[in-house]
Amino acid sequence: MSTNQIPLTDQGDNYVNVWSYVAQDLYNHYGETLYNSWFSKVNFIESSLNTVILCAPTNFIRDWIKSKYAMVILQLFQHYNNAIKSIEIITKELPGTTQAVIESPTKTFADIGNSALNSENIVSTLDVRFTFDNFVVGVPNELAYAAARAVAESSGAVFESNPLFLYGGVGLGKTHLMHAIGWYIKQNNPRRKVIYMSAEKFMYQFVKALRNKEVILFKEKFRSVDVLMIDDIQFICGKDSTQEEFFHTFNTLIDNNRQMVISCDRSPSDLDNIEDRIKSRLGWGLVADVHSTTYELRLGILESKIEQMNVKIPKDVINFLASKIVSNVRELEGALNKVIAHSNFTLKAITLENTQNILRDLLRSNERIITVEDIQKKVASRYNIKLSDMYSSRRLREVARPRQIAMYLSKTLTPKSLADIGKKFGKKDHTTVMHAIKKVEELLENDIELREEINLLMKILQN
């Protein structure tokens, strides 16, 4: 960062300049994913005395920045001008917009409560393991978590970005967040009517209603709720009748200020075989990507799970699991459960060697999928260097750094020894590989942008 102090007594353009420097610092420090989630749409408004006023696009983003990042932003402003004593973050509503408040369902809809079609209890469909308290938050899922929390805590008002659309790969926490919303509402506002179900079950209930001539009851059931959560919406792709019913249900709920939460394995724009009008509406609200887990997040998930289970696991075993089981949270927790169960049944201590033996089939599966050659090709392509540079000894930073990253990924994603990895990189010895891995690990401690880049490469390689 520049150490030049920029006077705020100059023309207004200087105020904007300071914010542009602060925004760049936020991008450099937190990385592209988090920056785009929270700061990219924040604008400088004005400076009043020693206070800088910023404008956030929504109350939700304003409140989250205030609670999590206000002090950091103030310190960055003060770095450029120490006359600044405080910051204020506001929102400016568009003309004609109002806060939507949910009214109680009409008596007509409430009267169907005893219908067989409507007899299921929301609590019976929720998993007791999936609450906000045991959801581990990290950079890859922070936006999704904050939005889900805001929906749950809305206390009768609709979350300002409706619907909330969560998307990401299998086992990354989307379903966990939807269950957590359901639990929170039932515990803190039990009079609100909530339905959570998979898109597949939604379709089957619709088909059953058609067969039993209970379509009116079906419509009333889903259109009278306060919160409707549909998991894995991609299931209705190519199913025209179900799409038609979902479309009208969606419109009715949104028009009546009811909350919708949708999950999917891809973004709305990437959905195929689904009507454009549905695709458009799914993107109306907040679209939150649940990214692949980082090493730090996997470590946090393991430590949280171990604490819940009240077991003792050696640190080297935890680090091994966090570095080797990178596909998704579900597989990570499954591997941990398998290691603990094996120890309980055999009365053998949990050691790194035992863990490697217990999980050898899973690790071999990963080995079959990813090779050192795969890593070299992907990294070379990503950094726009020649594949031959992976085998060379060129020390130019634009070549050496990608080569170090490729060595780090080879150690992380394959079971190859340092010596074997060295052979794949132009017959380099194991100390060269060790140095490269150590260098990347040191950079990852503070370089969030590099961390996200490596996580992206892992995601590409695993898919």
UniProtKB/Swiss-Prot annotation:
InterPro entries: AAA+_ATPase, Chromosome_initiator_DnaA, Chromosome_initiator_DnaA-like, Chromosome_initiator_DnaA_CS, DnaA_C, DnaA_dom, DnaA_N_dom, DnaA_N_sf. Residues 344-463 are annotated as: Domain IV, binds dsDNA. Keywords: ATP-binding, Cytoplasm, DNA replication, DNA-binding, Lipid-binding, Nucleotide-binding. ATP binds at residues 171, 173-175. One of its GO terms (biological process) is regulation of DNA replication. Its main location: cytoplasm. Belongs to the DnaA family. HAMAP family: DnaA_bact. Plays an essential role in the initiation and regulation of chromosomal replication. ATP-DnaA binds to the origin of replication (oriC) to initiate formation of the DNA replication initiation complex once per cell cycle. Binds the DnaA box (a 9 base pair repeat at the origin) and separates the double-stranded (ds)DNA. Forms a right-handed helical filament on oriC DNA; dsDNA binds to the exterior of the filament while single-stranded (ss)DNA is stabiized in the filament's interior. This is Chromosomal replication initiator protein DnaA. It comes from Rickettsia prowazekii (strain Madrid E).
